């Protein structure tokens, strides 16, 4: 986007933003986006989940830059660095093993809690709601992991906005508790894990109709963290009310299992 005067001799200059496409270098795309954000504008980088690991160190340095910039009084807030990952580890029918690495979540998790946000929308409307939110934020690194293929649509737009605002909630229409104490909690985070949990509930309703199942979906991963450690985190009281204190919890998670352990090991 060219913001100053365009003269007759100029070529390939325009006043509208453009999509920079088909540059097979995450380094180049990440660097261009960071520079673009420094001009006060907005943007996002889209990459395969497995290959975003190429810019691990660049994102780490941007997180450090955000921290230091916030300490300088005359620095204005910058639009967030938004990272959208598709072609994720659960949809690799043609590429397979080489394209399966959800570890970028692990890479971001230890960063400063006032900088990092991680989202796992599970249908089109939750993705739209999530993207609408992150595009308005400042001074964050927002990670969104989502499918680029046709997927079931579970929520209306109104329901999706409500669910994403909470970040984590029971999918009451999928639960089989009928308002009673559950026998088991099935939790999920990510589009494919959510599909698998809902399929499991469907099977269990047929095979074990007496089983009371509570289904919980997590869009904002940092909700699982304690509110003492992350501003998005649930309080212990909120967590216990949602997940129960004495029922088995089966968690279907998009990434590596140690992420859930790290976020919840101090919970009830």
What does each model-identified segment do?
Residues 1-268, ...:
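Thiamine diphosphate
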């Amino acid at each position: 986007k060219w913001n100053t005067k365009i003269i007759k001799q100029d070529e390939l200059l325009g006043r509208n933003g453009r999509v920079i496409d088909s540059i097979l270098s995450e380094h180049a795309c990440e660097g261009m986006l960071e520079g673009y954000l420094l001009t006060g504008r907005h943007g996002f980088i889209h990459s395969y989940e497995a290959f975003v690991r190429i810019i691990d160190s660049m994102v780490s340095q941007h997180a450090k830059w955000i921290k230091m910039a916030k300490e300088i009084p005359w620095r204005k807030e910058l639009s967030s660095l938004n990272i959208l990952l598709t072609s994720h580890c659960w949809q690799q029918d043609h590429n397979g093993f080489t394209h399966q690495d959800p570890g970028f979540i692990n890479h971001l998790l230890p960063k400063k809690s006032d900088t990092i946000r991680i989202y796992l929308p599970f249908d089109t409307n939750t993705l739209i709601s999530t993207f609408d939110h992150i595009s308005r934020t400042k001074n964050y690194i927002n990670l969104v992991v989502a499918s680029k293929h046709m997927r079931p649509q579970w929520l209306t737009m109104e329901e999706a906005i409500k669910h994403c605002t909470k970040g984590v909630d029971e999918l009451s229409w999928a639960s089989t508790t009928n308002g009673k104490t559950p026998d088991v909690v099935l939790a999920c985070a990510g589009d494919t894990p959510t599909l698998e949990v809902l399929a499991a509930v469907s099977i269990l309703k047929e095979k074990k109709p007496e089983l009371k199942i509570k289904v919980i979906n997590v869009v904002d991963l940092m909700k699982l963290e304690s509110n003492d450690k992350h501003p998005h985190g649930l309080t212990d009281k909120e967590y216990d009310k949602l997940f129960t204190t004495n029922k088995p919890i089966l968690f279907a998670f998009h990434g590596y299992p140690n992420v859930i352990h790290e976020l919840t090991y101090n919970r009830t």
